[in-house]
Amino acid sequence: MVHLTPEEKSAVTALWGKVNVDEVGGEALGRLLVVYPWTQRFFESFGDLSTPDAVMGNPKVKAHGKKVLGAFSDGLAHLDNLKGTFATLSELHCDKLHVDPENFKLLGNVLVCVLAHHFGKEFTPPVQAAYQKVVAGVANALAHKYH
């Protein structure tokens, strides 16, 4: 559960309505793979990830980034039940993929950076603060099934 004030919830929802999920998703996942290259080990089947340009131009990275942000959108629609919303993904990432849950925090922070880049002055400090709460809540929900 994420505790947002009505103003924060409104700010998150208003900005998210303007997000191009295809573009932002691919950019966020691509940046994660470039900035934190050890995360690439989970995406070996994606082909060439040898350079920043290869990562950022990789169609599989873009497609998976879109999928990730689709799940994030679901979370925004269920802020009062993030653990329930992400239970299946938490299990998958824990039991099958063995993803270090710290990576969820990294991706959340990268997403905030990408949103700031895309929205500039519209991404005010209060909007950022609200998004930081949301990405922390999502990361916590995704880590819920870890033992």
Swiss-Prot record:
The modification Phosphothreonine is found at residue 13. GO terms for cellular component: extracellular space; haptoglobin-hemoglobin complex; hemoglobin complex. Pfam families: Globin. The modification N-acetylvaline is found at residue 2. Heme b binds at residues 64, 93. GO terms for biological process: hydrogen peroxide catabolic process; nitric oxide transport; renal absorption; response to hydrogen peroxide. Red blood cells. One of its GO terms (molecular function) is metal ion binding. The modification Phosphoserine is found at residue 45. Keywords: Acetylation, Heme, Iron, Metal-binding, Oxygen transport, Phosphoprotein, S-nitrosylation, Transport. Residues 3-147 form the Globin domain. InterPro entries: Globin, Globin-like_sf, Globin/Proto, Hemoglobin_b, Hemoglobin_oxygen_transport. The keyword Phosphoprotein applies. It comes from the Eukaryota. The modification S-nitrosocysteine is found at residue 94. The modification N6-acetyllysine is found at residues 60, 83, 145. Belongs to the globin family. Heterotetramer of two alpha chains and two beta chains. Involved in oxygen transport from the lung to the various peripheral tissues. This is Hemoglobin subunit beta. It comes from Gorilla gorilla gorilla. The gene is HBB.
